[in-house]
Amino acid sequence: MKKVVNIEKTDSNFENYTLFDIETTGLNRSKDFMYMFGICEKKDNELIYSQYYIEDEKEEKELILELSKLLNNKKIISYNGDRFDFPFIRKKMEKYNIPKFNFENTDIYRQLQKLNLFRRA
């Protein structure tokens, strides 16, 4: 597993939240695998962007374990996390017998859906 980190100064005010997203090889929770996840957290006056990724499906369990450790008891902001990311992760946790972790998720995709910005005429 590899990790890439970028840090930049900020005055934004989203303390105590973790921005989160995953990347997978496809949409099928049983056949495809997760090869990357990214998080962004604010610490003091810095935004810390971290990406965790694997190059081989055999490392997927290690990636899921790291994800569960980092996101446990966090307030998360995701985009379509309720419908895709977290169901995908839960399926993989079952596969690898990894215990569930606690988190609170705000899915901005669901919030945007309520605004009907994408409705067809």
Give the role of each language-model region.
Residues M1-E15:
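N-terminal accessory regions of nucleic-acid-interacting proteins
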Residues T10, L27-K31, L117:
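Hydrophobic, well-ordered secondary-structure scaffolds
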Residues E15, D32-M34, L47, L71:
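Short connector loops at helix/strand junctions that flank enzyme active sites
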Residues N16-T25:
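Two-metal-ion RNase H-like nuclease active-site motif
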Residues I22, Y35, Y79-G81:
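Long, contiguous hydrophobic alpha-helical segments, chiefly transmembrane helices and signal peptides
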Residues T24, N28-K43:
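RNase H-like nuclease fold core
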Residues L47-A121:
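Conserved DEDDh/DEDDy metal-dependent 3′-5′ exonuclease domain
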